C-alpha cells in the first residue's frame, strides 16, 4: 500500500 509510504515521505 502507498499509504504507509506517504507517511514516510513526509
Curated annotation (Swiss-Prot):
One of its GO terms (biological process) is neuropeptide signaling pathway. Its main location: secreted. One of its GO terms (cellular component) is extracellular region. Keywords: Amidation, Neuropeptide, Pyrrolidone carboxylic acid, Secreted. The modification Pyrrolidone carboxylic acid is found at residue 1. It is found in: Secreted. Belongs to the myosuppressin family. Myoinhibiting neuropeptide. This is Myosuppressin. It comes from Namaquaphasma ookiepense (Gladiator bug). The lineage of its organism: Eukaryota, Metazoa, Ecdysozoa, Arthropoda, Hexapoda.
Amino acid at each position: 500500500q502507498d499509504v504507509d509510504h506517504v507517511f514516510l515521505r513526509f
